Amino acid sequence: MNDQLTAIYTELLLMKEELQSRLFEYSCFQVSTSPQAAINQKQKATLIYHIKEELQDVLLALSKIENGTFGYCEETGAPIPLAKLAVLPTARTANDFLYSVQFEKKTLPIWKSTDIEYGQALYE
């Protein structure tokens, strides 16, 4: 493992530790029946969901480093430069570095048929 990959691996380990501690922190909340508490619980549930998503990405990147498959685009198989991966170590494809893709990924929710309607969710 070269120095650049070792630095990325170390960064991912730190990210994993931080995300696990944040997940534990937000998972330990008390149940209350007040309307304000219900809103706070929804916010915490959303935070927990995003933390779990990030943690899965970090664990996948760590696994790829350990297996020797880190740094290759999952769509094309083309190598991704380590300089780019140093900035975004959880990237899975070359498209992950495009601003527009990242913007849509972080801001637009993915709705399932069981979820509430999009317009309704915006105003709750």
Swiss-Prot record:
Molecular function via GO: zinc ion binding
Zinc finger (dksA C4-type) residue numbers: 73-94
A Pfam family annotated for this UniProt entry: zf-dskA_traR
Lineage: Bacteria, Bacillati, Bacillota, Bacilli, Bacillales
Transmembrane segments: none
Listed name of the protein: Uncharacterized protein YlyA
Lineage top rank: taxon: Bacteria
UniProt keyword terms in alphabetical order: Metal-binding, Zinc, Zinc-finger
